[in-house]
């Protein structure tokens, strides 16, 4: 699946989202997917090529690079975006199932009076209620979990969010402790902090949307006749 396909699927989910959900999707597309596709390769394209160590020992440079960068930042962010977007696909499948059921009932004549034709069923906005409410709420909950887990993994794996100019490595087969230099550390630090900040904003938006959905759910129950 490429980014265009993912965008078209999530765009379909956006039609049935709350206002906060629409803001989250906008942030996801503009500040994460677009930035990752357009700018990430320019910033991180020289990762291993310009990782220089002051030794000529064969294999030392590769081992040190693997020690400090076990997973490429770009690949980790791409995996994060895929995992964060996956719960929204569950909502898309649930909406598609509901429409399929309505089409089936329409063809049988059970809901002929509710819709003019099948095209109206396709374009109708599906309300977030009933079982769809649970699917939608669960998807947001898992988005928060995935975002938090990836931020924690990123922090642990790279020992923080700031890129050092110089790192020391004594892994085998290096003959002793060698100095290794990272290319453009300031630029990479700024980019990393930006991506982490956007992840934090997405978490806040998801938590806000969860609170909104629960408040609306509770207020709806309180209005029902006893």
Curated annotation (Swiss-Prot):
Its main location: membrane. Keywords: Calcium, Cell junction, Cell membrane, Disulfide bond, Gap junction, Hearing, Membrane, Metal-binding, Transmembrane, Transmembrane helix. Ca(2+) binds at residues 42, 45, 47. InterPro entries: Connexin (IPR000500), Connexin26 (IPR002268), Connexin_CCC (IPR019570), Connexin_CS (IPR017990), Connexin_N (IPR013092), Connexin_N_sf (IPR038359). One of its GO terms (molecular function) is calcium ion binding. One of its GO terms (biological process) is response to lipopolysaccharide. It is found in: Cell membrane; Cell junction, Gap junction. Liver, kidney, intestine, lung, spleen, stomach, testis and brain, but not heart and adult skeletal muscle. It is a multi-pass membrane protein. It comes from the Eukaryota. Structural component of gap junctions. Gap junctions are dodecameric channels that connect the cytoplasm of adjoining cells. They are formed by the docking of two hexameric hemichannels, one from each cell membrane. Small molecules and ions diffuse from one cell to a neighboring cell via the central pore. A hemichannel or connexon is composed of a hexamer of connexins. A functional gap junction is formed by the apposition of two hemichannels. Forms heteromeric channels with GJB4. Interacts with CNST. This is Gap junction beta-2 protein. It comes from Rattus norvegicus (Rat). The lineage of its organism: Eukaryota, Metazoa, Chordata, Craniata, Vertebrata.
